[in-house]
From Swiss-Prot:
GO terms for cellular component: actin cortical patch; cellular bud neck; cellular bud tip; mating projection tip; membrane; mitotic actomyosin contractile ring; plasma membrane. Residues 24-50, 132-160, 173-316, 541-576 are annotated as: Disordered. GO terms for biological process: actin cortical patch localization; protein localization to actin cortical patch; protein localization to mitotic actomyosin contractile ring. The keyword Metal-binding does not apply. It is a peripheral membrane protein. One of its GO terms (molecular function) is protein-macromolecule adaptor activity. Residues 191-206, 544-556 have a biased composition (Basic and acidic residues). Residues 304-313 have a biased composition (Pro residues). The gene is BSP1. This is F-actin capping regulator BSP1.
């Protein structure tokens, strides 16, 4: 525990407070003076009146009370908390016994009118009881009788009831104690010693046996059996078993008595009332007699362990029941005859009615000649599914034969056979060769070489096919006015320039290329001057360079995916 060091001034102040407190408690009168009854308003709001008196200068409480109050508040705020309190603080010493409890205890006492013999017997019992209680109290710790304290695990003392006990000397000394073996009677008990002897000259009355102080040594069963006083009753032999053959019983009655055939229901077991054994009060000596006499085992008296018997083989219930039924000599009795009905219950109409004798049926001989019938062809029960359906006759198809023929032909030849025959037309290009040049004529055609003709036609066809495969030309952009004027000037210059080479010097291939290019230009609606590079393949170097420069200058800025000029679209002014 930590010690709290206090200021010496505080200790001095608290000592003064304690002195004032002791004076105050010493001067308390035994009966408090009846003070003025406060009004309900004053009792509830006493703090407000006290503040008002303090403001006016009137001090209601004395200096001692104020000092005590301030010291108490200081102690509660700064001092360590107490873990326990004294009995005086809890007001446990001031509790007085209640008068109603005494009245209830007095009411519990019962009064009886008894004879003189019963009274003397009661006094003897009380004397023996007080002696036993005094011996028991010596061992127990002594408790000082003082003011009532809260019980700490000890039960409260019970209020004792005074009840007279009637004793009959003619009855046996001990009450029969219920035991497992009803036939065996317990041995006689020893007599008790008398603690208090009451002698009367007139008559001698028997005294009850007292409880011995020392525990008696239990005797061995062999020595006890030798005594002539203790008579051991002979064991009753069980009745001899009766043979089953002597008892005439039917098969049904044997089944009813059998344990296997008896139906055990849950309700029947629950409804059987259980016999409750009333436990009577057993005395100390009786409990000693009931205990088994166990002596410390010695080497001589120690019994030899018996060898365990082999477990009996369990026979199933069904087999044992069947064997017992086969071994039993049961005679089946005939069905008992029904008793006759009494005359009062008989019906007069039924008795008068006579039963008619049964007439045997007549045997009639029928001489009927049956005609001969044709043998019937029995159809099989299981009909075939194919015969039951009537399928129409169809024409035989040559599909399989054609398939076999097609499989023999190779795949390449199949494709050629499936192609449609086209009419061979002469190409239009050699027919228009005469229109290529106005002044000059081709020398190769005059000679009439057929081989050169065929070669030229094949080349022209290949050129035409290549042109078809080319991607479509992008649309031209819209040309502005200054560009258009510039193009017109260039076109005029190109027309005025003289042709350097004659058309005679051009080859047939160049002429064919020129014709195909002119057709493409007409189809696309383009200017003829733009494709001047293709037409003049065999021209001089000066002419080709001049044409390239003109094409580069006149080439418009065309985007392949757009049809308008570059830049955003111009919007008309909305606010004019």
């Amino acid at each position: 525990m930590t010690k709290y060091e206090r200021d010496p001034e505080l200790v001095n102040f608290l000592s003064k407070v304690e002195d004032l407190n002791s004076k105050r408690y010493s001067n308390i009168p035994s009966s408090k003076p009846a003070g003025e009854a406060l009004s309900p308003v004053r009792s509830h709001n006493s703090g407000e009146y006290r503040r008002a008196d303090m403001m006016t200068g009137k001090n209601v409480e004395g200096c001692d009370n104020l000092a005590y109050r301030s010291a108490y508040n200081y102690e509660m705020t700064f001092s360590p908390k107490k873990t326990h309190y004294s009995l005086s603080e809890l007001n446990l010493e001031r509790i007085t016994p209640r008068p109603d409890l005494e009245g209830s205890a007095s009411q519990k006492e019962k009064k009886f009118l008894i004879s003189e013999e019963d009274y003397l017997l009661l006094q003897k019992l009380k004397a023996s009881q007080t002696y036993n209680d005094s011996n028991a109290d010596k061992n127990l710790p002594s408790f000082e009788k003082g003011p009532r304290m809260p019980s700490r695990g000890r039960p409260r003392p019970r209020e004792k009831e005074i009840i007279t006990i009637q004793y009959d000397f003619e009855l046996p000394g001990r009450a029969d104690i219920p035991s497992s073996s009803s036939s065996s009677s317990p041995p006689p008990l020893p007599t008790r010693r008398d603690h208090i002897k009451i002698t009367d000259g007139n008559e001698e009355k028997p005294l009850l046996p007292t409880r011995p102080n020392k525990a008696e040594v239990t005797e061995s069963p062999s020595s006890r059996s030798i005594k002539p006083d203790a008579v051991v009753p002979e064991r009753v032999k069980p009745a001899p078993p009766v043979s089953r053959s002597t008892k005439p019983a039917s098969f049904l009655s044997s089944l009813e008595d059998n344990k296997l055939t008896k139906a055990k229901s849950y309700n029947s077991e629950m409804e059987t009332p259980k016999t409750t054994v009333k436990s009577s009060h057993i005395d100390y000596l009786d409990s000693i007699q009931l205990k088994p006499t166990t002596l410390s085992p010695t080497m001589k008296n120690k019994p030899k362990p018996t060898p365990p018997s082999p477990p009996a083989k369990r026979i199933p219930r069904s087999e044992s029941f069947i064997k017992s039924m086969l071994n039993s000599n049961l005679t089946t009795t005939s069905k008992p005859s029904l008793p006759e009905k009494p005359q009062k219950l008989r019906n007069a109409n039924l008795a008068a009615h006579k039963t008619k004798p049964s007439i045997p049926p007549k045997k009639v001989e029928l001489n009927i000649v049956l005609p001969e019938l044709r043998p019937v062809e029995t159809s099989p029960t299981k009909q075939n599914f194919e015969n039951s359906i009537d399928l129409p006759k169809l024409r035989s198809s040559n599909r399989n034969i054609k398939k076999e023929e097609e499989d023999s032909i190779p795949e390449a030849i199949k494709g050629i056979q499936n192609l449609k025959k086209t009419k061979q037309q002469k190409p239009a290009i050699p027919q228009k060769k005469s229109f290529l040049t106005n002044n000059s004529k081709n020398t190769t055609l005059k000679n009439g070489d057929d081989i050169n003709k065929l070669n030229d036609e094949i080349e022209a066809l290949s050129l035409r096919n290549n042109l078809k495969k080319r991607p479509p030309t992008a649309p031209q952009r819209k040309i502005s006015l200054p560009e258009a004027l510039r193009k017109v000037e260039l076109m005029k210059k190109s027309k005025t320039e003289p042709v350097l080479e004659s058309s005679n010097e051009l080859s047939i291939n160049a002429k064919l290329d020129a014709i195909i290019a002119s057709r493409n230009l007409r189809a696309s609606n383009t200017l003829p001057e733009l494709s001047g590079v293709n037409t003049n393949i065999a021209t001089s170097d000066k002419y080709t360079t001049s044409r390239d420069e003109t094409v580069k200058e006149t080439k418009p800025l065309v985007h392949p995916n757009k049809n308008r000029t570059r830049g955003p679209r111009r919007k008309l002014p909305t606010r004019v």
